[in-house]
């Protein structure tokens, strides 16, 4: 093959990067030693990789175009860039392109040492009245916060962070084993892709420290049991200036002595006298906001009936709509009656029996069974 890199790849000197890559992949697959029996395949494969290694780099390509092939090669040799070392670097690149082409993967890009902080979860218990009105709660927890000495950079004041020269900022190195490559964390930068020559003494180069925090969180009115509220950026600080995680506050509402919650509706047991149940009337009932309202009891109300107070339940979160309060009637029978009350009830009993005897209903049907 000709030593002209453009001719090796079969492209013109004005070829775009996309055209270069397309030509490179086609030839690399054709001449890869593991995919062909051609005796000259390995030599051709090395030439293809050397050509692409230069032309894919805009600075190297510009130098190659300016000085020509021979001068460029001599300069590379004096700079210590042997062809054997370049070949191993390039073969790792080709495997990345193979996987990208066939499996949807991609060549690993330089990593950033600015890793995002972890999300945090906080369990907060409130009562039903607090859930109704909404409340501002102060919470305390420990987490990683930005180092106040290096301001999150991880390096001593005035020091700069440099790209790792062992992995080129990728954070990993590759070892070839046959057709496959094994990727492992770079031993020099520990997978960070960057080198801190003089780490901050307080945070040991991490850019963050452990600290107890106090935070005021707003709980909106109408929050339900099990609601998760997200506080963006209030989680753990990121590594070396990375974005902070989020804080998730999980709400638990303690059971109430009077009300049972069903979404935005409230249910409660309402005891009334049998007189009120029979005659009807109005009674005062307490509602969740801490006052009393009138409830009309229809005459003839039965035990277990449900009476609804519209818009007297819980508010719906971030809405002006409220649920209802549903009362479950429980008729109370007096245990201790005065003589006068007993006499009146006896009269009521006689009249009730007389009415049932005359209406030919259930009472007469039962009576006929014994006659």
From Swiss-Prot:
Domain J: 4-68
Binding site for Zn(2+) 1: 147, 150, 200, 203
CXXCXGXG motif repeats: 147-154, 164-171, 186-193, 200-207
SUPFAM superfamilies associated with the record: Chaperone J-domain, DnaJ/Hsp40 cysteine-rich domain, HSP40/DnaJ peptide-binding domain
Coiled coil regions, renumbered to chain: none
Domains: entry comment: The J domain is necessary and sufficient to stimulate DnaK ATPase activity. Zinc center 1 plays an important role in the autonomous, DnaK-independent chaperone activity of DnaJ. Zinc center 2 is essential for interaction with DnaK and for DnaJ activity.
Name by which UniProt lists this protein: Chaperone protein DnaJ
Origin organism lineage: Bacteria, Pseudomonadati, Pseudomonadota, Alphaproteobacteria, Rickettsiales
